[in-house]
Amino acid sequence: MLIHPQFDPVAIHLGPLAVHWYGLMYLLGFALFLTMGKYRLKNGNDVLTVPQLDDMLMYGAVGVVVGGRLGEVLFYQPGYYFSHPLEIFMVWKGGMSFHGGFLGVLIAVAIYGRKVGRGFWQLTDFVAPLVPLGLAAGRVGNFINGELWGRVASPELPWAMLFPQARMEDIAEAQQSADLMNMLMQYGGLLRHPSQLYEFALEGIVLFGALWIYSAKPRATGKVSALFLIGYGLARFVSEYFRNPDAGIFGKSDVISMGQWLSLPMIVIGVALLVFFGRRKQG
C-alpha cells in the first residue's frame, strides 16, 4: 500500500504571489511543445518558421486555457459553476477539461492557419506529436494536487494508494458494501488506483512515442492528426476504467464515464479521417 504524499499545491511563494505546481506543469508543457517543435523545424519540417511556431503557441495557449476551463464548466460541473460564477476564473485551483481544451486549440490553429496561409491539416499534423508530453505534464499536476484519483483498488495491488484528500468520498462510498467498509476501517480510507499516473503513461508517454515515430517519415496530409484522435481516444477510454468517474452532464455512471462519452467521437472521427486521407492519397 502507498499513501499519497499530499504535496503542497503551491510550489513557490514570490511575495504575495503563490505559484502553483499545476500552473508550472502547464508552463512545462508549453516549453516541451516549443523544444520538440523547434527540433522538428530544424530537421527538415518546413511547415512553419521558428518565429511562427512561437506565435502559434500563444494562440494555442489561449485556446487550451479558455477551452479547457469552459469544457470543465459545461461538461462536468455546470451546476456548481453556475452557482459560483467567480470560480470559473480560478484556473489555478485546477479543473481543466482536455476535450474543451482540445476544441479550443483546434479553433486557435484554424485562426492562425488563416493568418499565415497554412492549411489546417498541415498544422494539426505538425502539432499532434507535440501535444502528448504536455498532457503528461498536466497529469503530473493532477497527481501533485491529489485530484482525479482512481477507483477503488484491491489491497493486493502493490501500488494501490490511499488518497487522504478523498476522505469524505471514501466514507460515502464505503456505505455501499461491507467489504468497502472493512477496507475503510482497516486502512483509514479506501485504497485506489493512482489513475493520474496511468493517464500520464498512456495519454502522455505512450501516445507521444507512437506519434513521434509515425510522423518521423512523410505521411499523407491528415493521417498524423487522425492517429492522434484514435490514439488519445483509446488511451483515455481505457484509463477511465481506473479513474473515479466524474458526474458530468449525464450523471455519474460506473458503466461509461463522461470522459469516455467525449472520447468516443474522437475515435470514430479519427478512424473516418484515416480512411478518408488514405483513399485520397491513393486517388
From Swiss-Prot:
<keyword id="KW-0472">Membrane</keyword>
<keyword id="KW-0997">Cell inner membrane</keyword>
<dbReference type="GO" id="GO:0005886">
    <property type="term" value="C:plasma membrane"/>
</dbReference>
<feature type="transmembrane region" description="Helical">
    <location>
        <begin position="56"/>
        <end position="76"/>
    </location>
</feature>
<dbReference type="Pfam" id="PF01790">
    <property type="entry name" value="LGT"/>
</dbReference>
<dbReference type="GO" id="GO:0008961">
    <property type="term" value="F:phosphatidylglycerol-prolipoprotein diacylglyceryl transferase activity"/>
</dbReference>
<feature type="transmembrane region" description="Helical">
    <location>
        <begin position="258"/>
        <end position="278"/>
    </location>
</feature>
<comment type="similarity">
    <text>Belongs to the Lgt family.</text>
</comment>
<protein>
    <recommendedName>
        <fullName>Phosphatidylglycerol--prolipoprotein diacylglyceryl transferase</fullName>
        <ecNumber>2.5.1.145</ecNumber>
    </recommendedName>
</protein>
<comment type="pathway">
    <text>Protein modification; lipoprotein biosynthesis (diacylglyceryl transfer).</text>
</comment>
<feature type="binding site">
    <location>
        <position position="139"/>
    </location>
    <ligand>
        <name>a 1,2-diacyl-sn-glycero-3-phospho-(1'-sn-glycerol)</name>
    </ligand>
</feature>
<feature type="transmembrane region" description="Helical">
    <location>
        <begin position="88"/>
        <end position="108"/>
    </location>
</feature>
<dbReference type="GO" id="GO:0042158">
    <property type="term" value="P:lipoprotein biosynthetic process"/>
</dbReference>
<keyword id="KW-0808">Transferase</keyword>
<keyword id="KW-0812">Transmembrane</keyword>
<comment type="function">
    <text>Catalyzes the transfer of the diacylglyceryl group from phosphatidylglycerol to the sulfhydryl group of the N-terminal cysteine of a prolipoprotein, the first step in the formation of mature lipoproteins.</text>
</comment>
<keyword id="KW-1003">Cell membrane</keyword>
<keyword id="KW-1133">Transmembrane helix</keyword>
<dbReference type="InterPro" id="IPR001640">
    <property type="entry name" value="Lgt"/>
</dbReference>
<feature type="transmembrane region" description="Helical">
    <location>
        <begin position="14"/>
        <end position="34"/>
    </location>
</feature>
